[in-house]
Curated annotation (Swiss-Prot):
Annotated binding of NADP(+), by residue: G126, A127, G128, G129, A130, N149, R150, T151, F152, S153, K154, M213, G238
Residues the entry annotates as binding shikimate: S14, K15, S16, T61, N86, D102, Y215
Catalytic activity, as annotated: shikimate + NADP(+) = 3-dehydroshikimate + NADPH + H(+)
Organism whose genome encodes this protein: Haemophilus influenzae (strain 86-028NP)
Keyword Iron belongs to the record: no
Keywords recorded for this protein, A-Z: Amino-acid biosynthesis, Aromatic amino acid biosynthesis, NADP, Oxidoreductase
Protein name in the entry: Shikimate dehydrogenase (NADP(+))
Pathway: Metabolic intermediate biosynthesis; chorismate biosynthesis; chorismate from D-erythrose 4-phosphate and phosphoenolpyruvate: step 4/7
InterPro entries: Aminoacid_DH-like_N_sf, NAD(P)-bd_dom_sf, SDH_C, Shikimate_DH, Shikimate_DH-bd_N, Shikimate_DH_fam, Shikm_DH/Glu-tRNA_Rdtase
Active site annotation, chain numbering: K65
Lineage: superkingdom: Bacteria
GO cellular component: cytosol
NCBIfam families linked: aroE, PRK00258.1-2
Length: 268
C-alpha cells in the first residue's frame, strides 16, 4: 500500500492523518497516512530513509518546512519563493519534488467563505514562515496586500521579494495605513502562547472580515476572541485552510482533487 506521512515536532496534535484518511475515503484511493515525529537533530536522515524505504510522499509541518525544502531536487514556483515546503512527492525517477500548498489552501478557503474578489485590500499581520507560504497565491488572486510586522526590516525584505508578482506594501505594526481592509489575516504565531498580534484595535475596526491562520478545537483563537470582543463577527479560523491545503497536497500525490468542503463539514 502506498505510504504517506506528516512530519513535525511536536506531532501528536496533528489533524493531518484524520483529514487525509477522509480525503482518501471520499475519492476511493487506497493509501496509508501516518504521523511521524521528526528528530530535531537528525530529521534529514529520517526523511531520506523514509523515502528510501518506499514512501510516496509526505507533508511537513513545524519546525521542518525550510529543512525539508533543502532536501528536494525540484520545486514548484510557490515553494521556491517561500523557501519552504509543506509537501514532498517522490517522482518516478526517484527525485524529491517540493511544493507549498499553504497559500493555495488559504485562497481556496477564502473562496469557500466568499471573501475573495479581485482587487481587494488585504492586511496581513506577521512576516514569518506562515506568511511566506501564502503571499504568491494571494497576489496571483489579484489581492492588494499591506504586510505588517513588528520588525520592519523583515517585512521590507519579504515585500521586495514578492513585488514582481503583484501589489504589496511593507509597513511596521505601528504604521499600518488607516483604510478599509476587505480581509485582515492573522499570520503571527502569538496565539500559540495565548497572545494576539500587537495591532491597534482601531485598525482592526477598519476590517470587513477577519481570518486567523491558526485554529483551536472547540474554542476561539485569541485573535478571533479579540475581534468578537470588538463587535467584529465576520470571522474564521484556519481549520478550512488546513483541510484545503491537505486537499491540494492529496491532488499532487494522487492526481485526484477531492471535495474539500465536504470533508471540512464532516470534521469541523
Amino acid at each position: 500500500m502506498d505510504l504517506y506521512a506528516v512530519w513535525g515536532n511536536p506531532i501528536t496534535q496533528s489533524k493531518s492523518p484524520l483529514i487525509q484518511r477522509q480525503l482518501a475515503a471520499q475519492t476511493h484511493q487506497t493509501m496509508e497516512y501516518i504521523a511521524k515525529l521528526g528528530n530535531l537533530d537528525s530529521f534529514e536522515q529520517q526523511l531520506l530513509a523514509f523515502f528510501e524505504e518506499g514512501a510516496k510522499g509526505c507533508n511537513i509541518t513545524s519546525p521542518f518546512k525550510e529543512r525539508a525544502y533543502q532536501l528536494a531536487d525540484e520545486y514548484s514556483q510557490r515553494a521556491k519563493l517561500a523557501e519552504a515546503c509543506n509537501t514532498l512527492k517522490k517522482l518516478d525517477d526517484g527525485k524529491l519534488y517540493a511544493d507549498n500548498t499553504d497559500g493555495i489552501g488559504l485562497v481556496t478557503d477564502l473562496e469557500r467563505l466568499n471573501w475573495l474578489r479581485p482587487n481587494q485590500h488585504v492586511l496581513i499581520l506577521g512576516a514569518g514562515g506562515a506568511t511566506k507560504g501564502v503571499l504568491l497565491p494571494l497576489l496571483q488572486a489579484q489581492q492588494n496586500i499591506v504586510l505588517a510586522n513588528r520588525t520592519f526590516s523583515k517585512t521590507k525584505e519579504l515585500a521586495e521579494r514578492f513585488q514582481p508578482y503583484g501589489n504589496i506594501q511593507a509597513v511596521s505594526m505601528d504604521s499600518i495605513p488607516l483604510q478599509t481592509y476587505d480581509v485582515v489575516i492573522n499570520a503571527t504565531s502569538a496565539g500559540l502562547s495565548g497572545g494576539t498580534a500587537p495591532v491597534d484595535v482601531e485598525i482592526l475596526k477598519l476590517g470587513l472580515a477577519f481570518y486567523d491562520m491558526q485554529y483551536a478545537k472547540g474554542t476561539d483563537t485569541p485573535f478571533i476572541a479579540l475581534c468578537k470582543s470588538l463587535g467584529l463577527t465576520n470571522v474564521s479560523d484556519g481549520f478550512g485552510m488546513l483541510v484545503a491545503q491537505a486537499a491540494h497536497s492529496f491532488h499532487l500525490w494522487r492526481g485526484v482533487m477531492p471535495d474539500f468542503v465536504a470533508v471540512y463539514e464532516q470534521l469541523k
